[in-house]
């Protein structure tokens, strides 16, 4: 009995020694790999913080036929199960007083109160008849003016700007190069600050980037220490402000997710579409 137990213990001990040797080897290999990695200060890639500035929908989308039927059903259930409002209770009391009037059981002093409830309903009816719904299709929609924020009111709009890279004009999300000592979100906030001449305010959604894009510089600009750039995107919702139409005509657009393909390069567009939603 003692011999099998001893062999088992020796086997366990031998396995543990082999595990320790493998573990030590893997740690030393990992240390060598980290030591061989270039430092961040000497990286040939430049870091950029980009701003994905969105204007949320200003109106709700039109209901589909199914949604209209569902809304009607829920409204009917609400009417059947809800309690009387204060005005409805007052109207019931008014009906009782009118019934008493017919039986000559009412007091003339109560007539003012009886008429007041009806007057309120008449005033509300007139207000309702005078109310006009705003147009969903704006003048900017009719002219296809994509520099205006007053378009596609039921869709998310994204800001694109036109920048010059070499001898080409390229549409991109607004971006700024990272500076030592600041966070990438700080870089994106500084990007927004470059548009501050238009008094634009926005709410950033988190501290982590929502996406990234890597590109190499043109061959004429590329060197061993300057291969390209890595762009990190940060989402923000527009609160107030807009571009000055006079100073930026033709240099920016507000577009929907479906319209991005008219401006962005295919590879850049693929990365941007990954973190954009249009609910």
UniProtKB/Swiss-Prot annotation:
Ribosomal protein in keyword set: yes
UniProt family annotation: Belongs to the mitochondrion-specific ribosomal protein mL46 family.
Swiss-Prot/TrEMBL keywords: Acetylation, Mitochondrion, Ribonucleoprotein, Ribosomal protein, Transit peptide
Database matches in CDD domains: NUDIX_MRP_L46
Quaternary structure, from the entry: Component of the mitochondrial ribosome large subunit (39S) which comprises a 16S rRNA and about 50 distinct proteins.
SUPFAM superfamilies the UniProt entry points to: Nudix
GO cellular component: mitochondrial large ribosomal subunit
Protein name: Large ribosomal subunit protein mL46
Cellular location(s): Mitochondrion
InterPro entries from the UniProt entry: NUDIX_hydrolase-like_dom_sf, NUDIX_hydrolase_dom, Ribosomal_mL46, Ribosomal_mL46_N, Ribosomal_mL46_NUDIX
Residues bearing the modification N6-acetyllysine: 230
Source organism of this protein record: Pongo abelii (Sumatran orangutan)
Pfam families linked: MRP-L46 (PF11788), NUDIX (PF00293)
PANTHER family per UniProt: 39S RIBOSOMAL PROTEIN L46, MITOCHONDRIAL PRECURSOR-RELATED (PTHR13124), LARGE RIBOSOMAL SUBUNIT PROTEIN ML46 (PTHR13124:SF12)
Single GO MF annotation: structural constituent of ribosome
Acetylation among keywords: yes
């Amino acid at each position: 009995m003692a011999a099998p137990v001893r062999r088992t213990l020796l086997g366990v001990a031998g396995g543990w020694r082999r595990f320790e040797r493998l573990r030590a080897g893997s740690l030393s290999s990992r240390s060598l790999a980290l030591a061989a990695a270039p430092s961040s200060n000497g990286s040939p890639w430049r870091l950029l913080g980009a701003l994905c500035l969105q204007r949320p929908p200003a109106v709700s989308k039109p209901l589909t036929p199914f949604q209209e039927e569902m809304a009607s059903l829920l409204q009917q259930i609400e009417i059947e199960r809800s309690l009387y409002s204060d005005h409805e209770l007052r109207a019931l009391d008014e009906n009782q007083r009118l019934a008493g009037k017919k039986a000559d059981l009412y007091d003339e002093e109560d007539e003012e109160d009886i008429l007041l409830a009806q007057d309120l309903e008449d005033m509300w009816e007139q207000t309702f008849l005078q109310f006009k719904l705003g147009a969903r299709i704006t003048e900017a929609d009719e002219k296809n003016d994509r520099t205006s924020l007053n378009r596609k009111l039921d869709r998310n709009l994204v800001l694109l700007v036109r920048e010059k890279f070499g001898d080409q004009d390229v549409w991109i999300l607004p971006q700024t190069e990272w500076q030592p000592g600041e966070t990438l979100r700080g870089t994106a906030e500084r990007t927004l600050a470059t548009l501050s001449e238009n008094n634009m305010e926005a709410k950033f959604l988190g501290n982590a980037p929502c996406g990234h894009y890597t590109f190499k510089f043109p061959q004429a600009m590329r060197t061993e220490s300057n291969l390209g750039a890595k762009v990190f995107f940060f989402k923000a919702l527009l609160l107030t402000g807009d571009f000055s139409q006079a100073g930026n005509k033709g240099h920016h657009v507000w577009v929907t997710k479906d319209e991005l393909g008219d401006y962005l390069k295919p590879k850049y567009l693929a990365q941007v579409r990954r973190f954009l939603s249009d609910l």
